[in-house]
A protein has these predicted regions:
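Asp-based, Mg2+/Mn2+-dependent phosphohydrolase catalytic module
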Residues: 2-30, 41-42, 46-60, 65-112, ...
Length: 177
């Protein structure tokens, strides 16, 4: 079960405060690349800034968690007005622990959100917090990522959660790799 998420959605923007309430979640640790924007893009994807504002208005704590370096993470976090952890070394639990502390919550109140099985999902499960898997916004072009995405196929969620408390963003995402 280390490689399986609690649930899967097409987009981070499909996550609602109602869904998080149902899960008992008060804070989210958010991956950046291919979760909130395309890989290495300094601008949030359409709808993400409004989604962040809506989550914050509902009292949901948000913290960015990335394996990337400060020059990538800091400006992106600043634009969204969010706290962050960079060089998190996912799937190791150090970054998750630091993010939970920054949010001032217990791990029982936090979920992780990301698009990669071997970093985001595995790391969340090792830290023992639920993971909401979102399909990547686009396919990466490097050979390493193409290889990694192929290795993820057996563990990809087979069903997208579409309960009544899920926003329907309309974004398709990459449903098959």
């Amino acid at each position: 079960m280390l490689f399986h998420a609690k649930l899967a959605l097409r987009s981070v923007c499909d996550i609602t405060p109602e869904l998080l309430g149902k899960l008992g979640v008060r804070g989210l640790l958010l991956d950046i690349d291919n979760t909130l924007t395309t890989h290495d893009n300094p601008t949030p994807a359409p709808g993400v800034e409004g989604w962040v504002a809506g989550m914050q208005a509902a009292g949901i704590s948000l913290c960015l968690g990335s394996n990337n370096h400060p020059p990538r993470v800091e400006p992106f976090a600043r634009r969204l007005g969010l706290d962050f952890v960079c060089e998190g070394k996912k799937p190791l639990t150090k970054g998750y622990r630091e993010a939970v502390q920054k949010m001032g919550l217990s791990r029982k109140e936090v979920a992780a959100v990301g698009d990669q099985i071997f970093t985001d999902v595995l790391g969340a499960n090792l830290f023992r917090v639920p993971c909401i898997f979102v399909f990547p916004m686009e396919m990466e072009k490097t050979k390493f990522f193409k290889f990694k995405r192929r290795m993820e196929v057996p563990f990809l969620p087979r069903k997208i959660y579409e309960g009544p408390e899920v926003a329907k963003s309309g974004r398709q995402g990459v449903d098959s790799i």
